[in-house]
Amino acid sequence: VKLDELTDYNKINDDPVRPHLSVDFRTAPGREIYCLNEDDDIKAIICVAYTNEVPIDESELEKLTQEHGEIAVFYTVWSYAKGAGRQMVLDTASFIKNNKPVKRFITLSPKTEMARKFHLSNGALELQDNALSVNYEYPSELI
């Protein structure tokens, strides 16, 4: 299983969290899409934006994104195999930690019980509960 940048952009149509976000939005400067591959079979996908502040909604995410932000914001993740979502988040965070000047790993998550259980069971802490989202933080020492 290996981490790659996503090149098959048709896969973003499968995004259950933010299907309305375009490829242009997801690949703008300061944003990246990664996938977890096993034998050329995509197991999970994550979209990341870099900021210097914690965004509370998509509008702030768009405004705050910059190429060299110190915060990696995971704003959508989905998987095609059991356990792949967890591995996707942790492997991506590890890759970013080792290759970019990022100090914090934050999510911009929907206010759902599924998102809450997913992030808390993977070691994240609830950072803040917003009107339209919840931010979870993955402690650096976990990564």
Model-flagged regions — what are they?
Residues 1-69, 78, 100-103, 134-143:
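Non-catalytic substrate-recognition and accessory regions of acyl/acetyltransferase enzymes
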Residues 58-123:
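Acyl-donor binding region in acyl/amide transferases
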Residues 125-137:
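Conserved catalytic-core motifs of GNAT/GCN5-like acyltransferases
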